[in-house]
């Protein structure tokens, strides 16, 4: 951690304990059924502002509404009908600040563990968990650390990660190695249309993001999963990303989806590639 991050962690750790009630709905909320003094409300808001950018959410903590860039409940609600987490050990790879894990915390899972190497998102999680007290565990680790983690899982969520990996088949193998017998992986990745066994590999960037590598056709994604020895490739949904789901707010810095697309043709990125579309799949071993 740098000095600013250490200061933020200290500020979070110095927050008083508050007897909160929680709501793990579309807006994940921590609130009190008694009057909270203005000094504490101000402190909570200032820490939340200092933790920007907030990519995933939304949250409301002691009357501070955190309007995140992504309306993450759209993705969660799309996947929820396919979730059966009762009594299971669950991992979320690339968990960001833990939004999806908080949403899962009332679905009966035995254990919920998030993996993400991002320090800023870890600090956001620590801030949220101070009030939510969900019991979710957060590890500052990535998908490459899974094989050596020492625990295996019944359900793994890997949402919006695969296109950031320069070796996606290896990442899939790392996910598979971390499953218990009969386990499942929920995947979400960007894709391109077509039936050919091909990928888009952006020259310099995709939607102004430099660490996006392979955008496969769905058939190619299935090939990757089969190469990693998964079976039962099940398409759950296909959805274009739009500005209802991802947009600029006061809780992020810089640009968002509207700035990443061609201003004259929203079906193309600023670089001229097809605009983002996502496929949601479940695979098993």
UniProtKB/Swiss-Prot annotation:
SUPFAM superfamilies: S-adenosyl-L-methionine-dependent methyltransferases. Catalyzes carboxymethyl transfer from carboxy-S-adenosyl-L-methionine (Cx-SAM) to 5-hydroxyuridine (ho5U) to form 5-carboxymethoxyuridine (cmo5U) at position 34 in tRNAs. It comes from the Bacteria. Keywords: Transferase, tRNA processing. It comes from Campylobacter hominis (strain ATCC BAA-381 / DSM 21671 / CCUG 45161 / LMG 19568 / NCTC 13146 / CH001A). InterPro entries: CmoB (IPR010017), Mo5U34_MeTrfas-like (IPR027555), SAM-dependent_MTases_sf (IPR029063). GO terms for biological process: tRNA wobble uridine modification. HAMAP family: tRNA_carboxymethyltr_CmoB. GO terms for molecular function: transferase activity, transferring alkyl or aryl (other than methyl) groups. It catalyses: carboxy-S-adenosyl-L-methionine + 5-hydroxyuridine(34) in tRNA = 5-carboxymethoxyuridine(34) in tRNA + S-adenosyl-L-homocysteine + H(+). Carboxy-S-adenosyl-L-methionine binds at residues 56, 70, 75, 94, 143-144, 163, 278. This is tRNA U34 carboxymethyltransferase.
């Amino acid at each position: 951690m740098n000095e600013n991050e250490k200061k933020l962690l200290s500020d979070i750790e110095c927050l008083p304990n508050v007897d909160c009630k929680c709501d793990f709905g579309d807006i994940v909320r921590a609130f009190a059924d008694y009057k909270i003094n203005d000094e504490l409300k101000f402190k909570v808001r200032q820490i939340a502002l200092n933790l920007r950018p907030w990519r995933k959410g939304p949250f409301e903590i002691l009357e501070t509404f955190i309007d995140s860039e992504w309306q993450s409940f759209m993705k969660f609600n799309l996947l929820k009908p396919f979730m059966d987490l009762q009594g299971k050990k669950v991992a979320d790879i690339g968990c960001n600040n833990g939004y999806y894990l908080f949403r899962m915390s009332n679905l009966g899972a035995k254990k919920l563990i998030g993996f993400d190497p991002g320090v800023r998102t870890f600090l956001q999680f620590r801030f949220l968990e101070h009030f939510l007290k969900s019991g979710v565990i957060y590890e500052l680790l990535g998908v490459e650390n899974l094989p050596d983690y020492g625990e295996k899982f019944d359900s793994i969520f890997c949402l919006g990660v695969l296109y950031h990996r320069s070796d996606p088949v290896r990442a899939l193998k790392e996910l598979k190695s971390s499953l218990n017998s009969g386990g499942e992986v929920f995947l979400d990745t960007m894709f391109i249309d077509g039936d050919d066994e091909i990928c888009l590999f952006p020259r310099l960037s995709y939607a102004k993001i430099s660490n996006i590598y392979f955008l496969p056709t769905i058939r190619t994604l299935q090939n990757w999963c089969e190469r990693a020895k998964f079976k039962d490739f099940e398409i759950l949904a296909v959805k274009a990303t739009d500005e209802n789901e991802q947009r600029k707010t006061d809780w992020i810095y810089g640009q968002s989806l509207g700035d990443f697309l061609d201003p004259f043709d929203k079906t193309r990125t600023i670089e001229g590639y097809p605009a983002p579309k996502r496929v949601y799949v479940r695979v098993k071993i």
